[in-house]
Design a protein with these regions (language model features):
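OB-fold and OB-like single-stranded nucleic-acid-recognition modules
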Residues: 4-147
Length: 147
C-alpha cells in the first residue's frame, strides 16, 4: 500500500474516533429504576440510621432558617411530615432557584437525598446535577418546580 493511501486511512480512522468521542459526550446513563423511599419509610430510615437514600416527601414548612453561605449557598427550612416527624431541607441556591415566596405554613413536596442525624435528618440534593452523576432532585412549592 502506498504512503498516501496509508495516510488517508489514518485520517479516516482518526476522524471516526473523533465522531465516536463527540457522540459519546451526549450519552446519558439510563436512570436507576430504584423507586425513591417515601414519607411512609422515613421512620424506618431514622430507626436504622440510614443515609444516602433518595426520598420523596410532602410536608408543611414549620420554620424558615437563615441561609448557609459557607461554601455553596443553601436555603434552609424545616418541614413537618403528616407523621409529626421533622426534616431539615437544605436547598442549594447556587445550582437551583431560591424559593423567595416560601412561608411558614406552606405545603411543599421534596425529592432529594436523605441524610440521617439525631434530630431526624435532612434532605439535600434538591437540585439538578450539572454533571449528571447524581439523581436530580427538586422542590415543588405552589405548583412551581425548583430544580
Amino acid at each position: 500500500m502506498s504512503k498516501p493511501k496509508r495516510m488517508q486511512q489514518r485520517v479516516w480512522i482518526i476522524f471516526g474516533f473523533a465522531i465516536l468521542i463527540f457522540m459519546g459526550s451526549f450519552y446519558e446513563p439510563a436512570p436507576q429504576n430504584n423507586p425513591p423511599a417515601t414519607a411512609s419509610n422515613i421512620e424506618q430510615l431514622i430507626e436504622q440510621r440510614q443515609s444516602d437514600v433518595q426520598i420523596e416527601v410532602s410536608g408543611t414548612v414549620t420554620r424558615l432558617l437563615s441561609d448557609d453561605n459557607d461554601g455553596s449557598r443553601h436555603q434552609r427550612f424545616i418541614i413537618e411530615l403528616a407523621s409529626g416527624q421533622t426534616l431539615l431541607i437544605v436547598h442549594n441556591i447556587d445550582l437551583a432557584p431560591r424559593i423567595d415566596d416560601i412561608r411558614e405554613g406552606d405545603e411543599v413536596r421534596v425529592y432529594g437525598e436523605y441524610i440521617w442525624n439525631d434530630k431526624g435528618g435532612l434532605i439535600h440534593w434538591t437540585h439538578h446535577d450539572p454533571a449528571n452523576r447524581h439523581p436530580h432532585g427538586w422542590i415543588r412549592h405552589q405548583d412551581r418546580l425548583y430544580q
